[in-house]
């Protein structure tokens, strides 16, 4: 199937399921099961319950989808996320 035939929806992750799957509530009101796309796994992008995501679906099976994008946090007033310390205090002499 060509990529031109896939359709995209936006939604909210409501539940994390086993085997790297997620239950997603679409903006249209439907609830589907989605799995993480390979590029997201490769780049170690974590998805948590409550995240806004973009889902790619086949028009032939509207019950399953592929999670292709996690939108950045849009929570007002929250501090920006910072990664773990890089270990700069220990240097080789």
UniProtKB/Swiss-Prot annotation:
* GO annotation, cellular component aspect: cytosol
Q: Where is the S1-like domain?
A: 1-72
Q: Does the keyword Ligase apply?
A: no
Question: Is Nucleotide-binding included in the keywords of this UniProt record?
Answer: no
Under the heading SUPFAM superfamilies, the entry gives:
Nucleic acid-binding proteins (SSF50249)
What PROSITE patterns is this protein classified in? Answer: S1_IF1_TYPE
Q: Record's superkingdom?
A: Bacteria
A Pfam family that this protein carries is eIF-1a
**CDD domains xref list:** S1_IF1
TM stretches of this protein: none
Question: Where does the record say this protein resides?
Answer: Cytoplasm
UniProt KW keywords: Cytoplasm, Initiation factor, Protein biosynthesis, RNA-binding, rRNA-binding
Checking InterPro entries in the record gives: NA-bd_OB-fold, RNA-binding_domain_S1_IF1, TIF_IF1
Task: Give one GO term, molecular function aspect.
Answer: ribosome binding
Q: Map out region (Disordered) in residue numbers.
A: 70-93
| Role played | One of the essential components for the initiation of protein synthesis. Stabilizes the binding of IF-2 and IF-3 on the 30S subunit to which N-formylmethionyl-tRNA(fMet) subsequently binds. Helps modulate mRNA selection, yielding the 30S pre-initiation complex (PIC). Upon addition of the 50S ribosomal subunit IF-1, IF-2 and IF-3 are released leaving the mature 70S translation initiation complex.
The text of the family note is: Belongs to the IF-1 family.
Quaternary structure per UniProt?
Answer: Component of the 30S ribosomal translation pre-initiation complex which assembles on the 30S ribosome in the order IF-2 and IF-3, IF-1 and N-formylmethionyl-tRNA(fMet); mRNA recruitment can occur at any time during PIC assembly.
The identity of this protein, by name, is Translation initiation factor IF-1
Could you tell me which species this protein originates from?
A: Nitrobacter winogradskyi (strain ATCC 25391 / DSM 10237 / CIP 104748 / NCIMB 11846 / Nb-255)
């Amino acid at each position: 199937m060509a990529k031109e035939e896939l359709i995209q929806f936006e939604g909210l992750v409501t539940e994390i399921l086993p085997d790297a799957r997620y239950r997603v509530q679409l903006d249209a009101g439907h609830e589907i099961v989605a799995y993480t796309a390979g590029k997201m796994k490769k780049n170690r992008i974590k998805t948590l319950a409550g995240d806004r995501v973009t889902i790619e679906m086949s028009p032939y099976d509207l019950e399953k989808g592929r999670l292709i994008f996690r939108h950045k946090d849009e929570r007002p007033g929250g501090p920006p996320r910072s990664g773990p310390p890089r270990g700069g205090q220990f240097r080789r002499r």
